[in-house]
Amino acid sequence: MFTGIIEEIGTVKQIRQGTASAVLNIRAERVLEGTKVGDSIAVNGICLTVTSLFPDAFTADVMHETLNRAAMSGLACQKRVNLERAMQINGRFNGHMVAGHIDGTGKIIHIHRDDTAVWFTIQTKPEIMRYIVEKGSVAIDGISLTAVNI
């Protein structure tokens, strides 16, 4: 489980395509602290398992279906990604509970900035909208947001 509070913005160093999956190599610093092989890190909100660690990066396998269905379809080298380690039972809980399993994708169709906030209008399919409630939480690229107007 994750909280939707991004710890760090990492950078995709390499994507190696395999027959059934791809291996992502992601440059990071903060999320590597205390992380072990087998731990979970959310990459743009998608729960991935760390398969190897380096001083400045980690790798994770991603199934092709995940790459094609989720917001990772446009992933490329040098792209920046939101990173968050799995929440700890004894840690602070901000944001909301984020499983790291993607229900669907949407498209930002309008952005409005005012003195206190940035407002996004996001369009998605009706089968996704039925799960979104006014004043409820939603994770966009792993970021915990509140749905204001439906």
Question: Where are the model-predicted features located?
Answer:
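Conserved loop->alpha-helix
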Residues: 1-150
